[in-house]
């Protein structure tokens, strides 16, 4: 069946993801291949000192993104979308959307970017003996309680952006377990909110005499593939005001961008992981069991089917590296050589592989902004060497490439060395891997693990949530999400894999020891360079 017939007969599946700067829709066929897409750019706004998106911006963004998809489908296939096999919604995780009994929002949506929750996160981490990050919904809620915000007593429902949109489209107050794990800790045995922590929280806030307890106001937790309701008539018109899109379509549990990223890179099985490396970076390793104790630099979330995931998030990755590459571009322009940025990156990155495995003693700190993992509230990009270090272009570029994943290594070394976590495969995606084979080899040395890069990983979260919508309707009886992805989606495609050599691993370890010893240099730069 060709694409036009697939669309017109309602066999296509739609995934929509709300990222922080772009809303993206992907339409896939029954074989899980993307056949069309649409997008819409949007921006958060700083209102009264807090980052937010208005409800109008959310619904306008959804309509515009879907209209762009419809237009592309019309142009490419001369077809109209009337009905779909299934729909999935995903969005950036965490943050705070609180509603009263009348379904009115009580304060403007507070996004994950807000860092006004330090006191709450700190107290809750101690109360639960579990690392609660600043951006989690429970940190936002507890900070509102500490700040004695009036609206708290009127809360009837608390959810994330994906949970809010799903609720409006279906009438169902539910959340996929991955997104839920960024609201409140999940017990990986029950695959639901941690009952002991729920009890502790309720007791801790009891003196406020709110009419609710925390379990009353959180969304119901659902696993991938579970029934999460259908698109209502109201919901269909919210997506497509033209009235073409029919209601009563199955909608899968809404998920967060971490979960859809795991799906898009086939990193759902225990002992697999994925790394995203661009302006910032993060790694997610799927664990066989919970960690022995909490670590401030490791966030615990889950896969969309409820396995525990250890996440290390770094604020800085490629920005400083890009600034150095731009310096070489300026030099080329100065001496009158035509500039092709892909060539500049390619030549410099590949030349880095000819450098010493320990970068000849050179160290770079790529801190454009602060870096919580290494305890810095602010950053100053810094390159440092001793007079007798081996200073040449290959070592210089290699040191800067190492720096781009250095903090990620420090966080993951805790997992691999202290917690003795084992990983069979890590899939990488993002701008760092655009030059074939270089960023991948550097990351393999950093994490002492084979690293795969897939062609499809660039499709990202909108494709990931479309795959979860496909799993809802197409899974076989008792077929796990990991098996479904292996058998129906990736079918043996692990992309190109690079395994590090012992010398590369040893070289990176030497570099990172020098890097850690030198951190006071970076702290001093922050103190004295304004």
Task: Annotate each language-model stretch with its function.
Residues 53, 57-61, 139, 438, ...:
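A general alpha-helical scaffold signature found inside nucleotide-binding enzyme cores
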């Amino acid at each position: 069946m060709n694409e036009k017939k697939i669309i017109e007969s309602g066999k296509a599946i739609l995934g929509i993801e709300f990222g922080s700067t772009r809303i993206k829709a992907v339409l896939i066929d029954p074989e899980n291949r993307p056949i069309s897409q649409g997008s819409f750019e949007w921006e958060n706004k700083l209102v009264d000192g807090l980052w937010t998106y208005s409800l109008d911006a959310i619904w306008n963004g959804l309509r515009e993104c879907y209209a762009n998809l419809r237009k592309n489908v019309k142009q490419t296939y001369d077809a109209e979308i009337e009905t779909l096999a299934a729909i999935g919604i995903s969005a950036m995780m965490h943050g705070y959307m609180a509603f009263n009994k009348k379904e009115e929002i009580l304060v403007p949506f507070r996004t994950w970017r807000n860092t006004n929750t330090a006191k709450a996160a700190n107290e809750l981490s101690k109360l639960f003996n579990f690392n609660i990050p600043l951006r989690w919904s429970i940190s936002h809620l507890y900070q509102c309680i500490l700040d004695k915000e009036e609206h708290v007593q009127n809360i009837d429902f608390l959810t994330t952006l994906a949970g809010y949109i799903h609720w409006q489209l279906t009438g169902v107050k539910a959340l996929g377990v991955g997104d839920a794990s960024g609201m409140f800790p999940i017990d990986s045995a029950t695959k639901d909110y941690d009952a002991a922590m729920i009890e502790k929280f309720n007791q801790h806030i009891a003196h406020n005499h709110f009419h609710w307890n925390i379990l009353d106001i959180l969304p119901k937790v659902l696993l991938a593939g579970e029934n999460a309701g259908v698109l209502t008539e109201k919901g269909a018109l919210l997506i497509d005001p033209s009235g073409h899109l029919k209601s009563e379509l199955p909608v899968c549990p809404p998920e967060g961008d971490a979960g859809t990223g795991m799906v898009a890179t086939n990193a759902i099985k225990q002992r697999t992981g994925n790394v995203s490396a661009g302006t910032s970076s993060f790694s997610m390793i799927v664990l066989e069991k919970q960690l022995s104790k909490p670590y401030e630099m490791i966030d615990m979330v889950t896969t969309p089917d409820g396995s525990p995931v250890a996440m290390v998030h770094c604020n800085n990755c490629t920005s400083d590296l890009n600034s150095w590459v731009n310096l070489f571009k300026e030099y080329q322009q100065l001496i009158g050589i035509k500039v092709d940025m892909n060539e500049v990156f390619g030549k410099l990155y590949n030349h880095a592989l000819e450098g010493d495995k320990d970068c000849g003693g050179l160290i770079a700190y790529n801190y454009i902004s602060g870096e919580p993992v290494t305890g810095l509230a602010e950053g100053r990009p810094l390159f440092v060497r001793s007079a007798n270090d081996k200073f040449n272009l290959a070592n210089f570029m290699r040191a800067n490439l190492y720096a781009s994943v250095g903090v990620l290594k420090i966080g993951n070394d805790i997992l691999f060395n202290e917690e003795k976590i084992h990983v069979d495969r890590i899939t990488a995606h993002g701008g760092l891997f655009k030059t074939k084979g270089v960023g991948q080899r550097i990351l393999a040395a950093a994490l002492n693990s084979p690293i795969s890069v897939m062609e499809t990983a660039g499709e990202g979260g909108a494709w990931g949530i479309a795959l979860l919508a496909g799993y809802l309707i197409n899974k076989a009886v008792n077929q796990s999400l990991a098996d479904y992805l292996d058998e129906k989606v990736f079918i043996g495609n692990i992309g190109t894999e690079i395994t590090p050599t012992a010398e590369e691993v040893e070289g990176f370890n030497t570099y990172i020891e020098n890097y850690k010893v030198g951190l006071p240099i970076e702290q001093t730069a922050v103190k004295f360079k304004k």
